[in-house]
């Protein structure tokens, strides 16, 4: 029988909030119906205030990750302890206390000769200090290990090429971090069209102990997710309820204290933390035979995200819509455990997954199409309902039974989330009853089990719950008595319209405040013209409704406010020169209703760029301006967009230059940590008042982004960086700013959000990565959520999962849409539990592992040093491959033997070592390195991997063979090439997609056809040195090339600039710098790196 939708065990923290925009009530409890398993990229409706058109697909099918500053005073932040409410925590902080299914960890890091990253173990980590240099705070582990596993690893030495110092010291990248959530996507009817979904494993018959107050023994088949075994939930292990009731909501209340607002934990209560006073008996889960492989439906090249073919029109009444029939009725024969076992006996794992590869002999392992995530080894009926890996992804798709087994594998266990991703199809439920577990507060999901029509068992804590009367009726089929066919139980990603008990106050209106630097340096760059024009062009597209408010502040050595009160003939400037004691003049006229004062707003935007053209003021009072903006927004909350062009020089928050160009390569001398805690403290105040701060830094000089970035990191904001911005001297940056502003201003947004991740009893979350503040042990505060933000979490196995066959993770994002609706977006992921090392390696997701390690390495760079982080990355490869060689390989062979799943692990780690965040040498300016680290912490995984390991294509011979079709466009799909000059030829043209930049290298002997039909020049010498756009020519070659580049650019958080590079162009050095497999001035080639790894593994 089908299993209703209780949230799967908490996994990665992903924003589960629904997209902005009210759902249109159509008389049925549900609005816009979902399309079966179509939870990929989505298009957002114009009515929601977002961009009406979203890109059709990502070039890679990986959840992206957003940039997150690290906790503490560092930009990339180290872990911090979570303390009482008053003490805020930011990304990359360790959680302390009794979180739901969380594991306490010790954040202290001891520096030492051999830095390591221990993984958390089942014992109390607080009792055991972490090994020196370890990334992961947590319990001590007996065996040596990497930062990934929360245990110590042995020292390894890695020789470096040329000037590169040798990599010594054992480093582990396992440190706690917190994840934040993203914005919601387009809502769709929960009504689906298409064929019925296959039956999910029904629950096994359960025998109840005498006296159990839960009624007669249930009948039916085995639960699809978990076997029914009685397990006692102790206060230590039981997850706490988190979302329901007024006392359990995902919201935050602010009270006044000493003149400022203080955040209280009420949102924690709304989301649901804590258990009911009355204990409820739970039943044991009989062991169920292991489910076997089902693979995701194949996706077109380039991970095309398109809606399923037969999407039913939203205008049709529920009765006329064809929702896939879920599990069979209870009267039918259930799919029991015996049936499952026999049906799976003939299945076997794909032989390719068991291949052992010698990387020294098989070096060309990079696939020619985008790398797809591994498919969990689950029964087909369960896998069909699983969460899309673009939204929710685990580093290990087979969860080890014990922490000892995880430690033995020496691979990091964690989740990567893209919770608020734009979706084409999103089921939205408008029912007044949200069904949740009464004990752990998990939302009903496809992986719960129905004992009968009146009771369901939670797949996270195993409590048996009653099915509410309203849940018995299925509005899609208009049939009573089919709770297992409800949308909540048929969709791993779903959005709920939250009732009043999920609100601590009326939903806040959309409030947008813009803070502009108007000093002489700022006016010289000319940025104000571009920003004001972009605002004018997109004013009507700002997400919101009739309550939308807007305001403006400018500053140099003083602060300027602008009264936009309705009835004024023109905006009035109010100047506050006392920056030591900032006050708000006429606060009621500074944030005004956009609809009522639109003409005044437009007048101000047209005149602002000219108002300061003759200014001679060179000072910058950024700190006081931020304080003023915070005071202005405190009563309502909202989004603050700050534009800064230089180092702050006046008042609180003033900074001094710290960069020394000659010491850029000195890992111990570079300043990756903040020089003041002012910006972090202010960010925490902002978070408490539901204010997020987005920073746009446009500067040609050092501006201490390590310090300034804290204002966004801890308030769940974003950082945008435009080095050497100038409207005349650097026009390409002007184009980039305008494109990114257009997306920034019009994308959907969620306000006053909180996110919580739950997981099956026995697993615990100990570290979050991303831009947010950890309000209480496991509740992430997100004043704003957006669809371009990614998050990651680290986990450990706290209790043995021996009696558990399946585990689940569930993230819940509660937020207010731009239309003023309170919504909850829930993602649930189900994975199998395994008992052998081979199975753990078989299910390893190398991209997710690399993304999590990158986040941990950023923290290590800040808390220890850049060299420690680099060593830890190398040791991550050495330790895992050593574990495989010693424990999983039946016979020892010469060479570097790796399991097929990890064949790209050394390549991706080498790419990380050469990425701007971690590379050595004097090429990278300090602010550029810090910004790269911000991107690692805040970008979804798909973009992080593109930035780390770019995709290289040959484009002078594009054809329609193998092309995909998106919205009547034909998109060529050239094969992906290895990043080595061996793959280049002077008679071709090669395009490199590095995420935030595109580079088109044209060989000196490139064919005349490409030059004339695509570039529009007669010969090679006529290619402009500064060409950044391709001409739109009326030729098939031009159309194919432009279509391919446009497709790559779609739906990127950052607009990728295109550089056309001639063979002798200065930009060629940047192009070759991304050739990861080749030797550079300070890094080994891929083959040399493999030899080093082999030497260490064979020791």
Swiss-Prot record:
Ribosomal protein listed as a keyword = no
InterPro entries noted in UniProt: ADF-H/Gelsolin-like_dom_sf, Gelsolin-like_dom, Gelsolin-like_dom_sf, Sec23/24_helical_dom, Sec23/24_helical_dom_sf, Sec23/24_trunk_dom, Sec23_24_beta_S, SEC23_SEC24_subfamily
Entry keyword annotation includes Repressor: no
Which GO molecular function terms does the record list? SNARE binding; zinc ion binding
Location relative to the cell = Cytoplasmic vesicle, COPII-coated vesicle membrane; Endoplasmic reticulum membrane; Cytoplasm, Cytosol
Q: Where are the Gelsolin-like repeats?
A: 972-1044
The ranges of region (Zinc finger-like) come to: 437-461
- Region (Disordered), start-end ranges: 1-36, 65-139, 279-317
Q: In which residue ranges is the amino acid composition biased (Polar residues)?
A: 10-20, 68-90, 108-126, 279-292, 303-317
Q: What is its main location?
A: membrane
Matching Gene3D superfamilies = beta-sandwich domain of Sec23/24, Sec23/Sec24 helical domain, Severin, von Willebrand factor, type A domain, Zn-finger domain of Sec23/24
Q: What's this protein's family per the entry?
A: Belongs to the SEC23/SEC24 family. SEC24 subfamily.
Name by which UniProt lists this protein? Protein transport protein Sec24A
Instruction: State the species of origin.
Output: Bos taurus
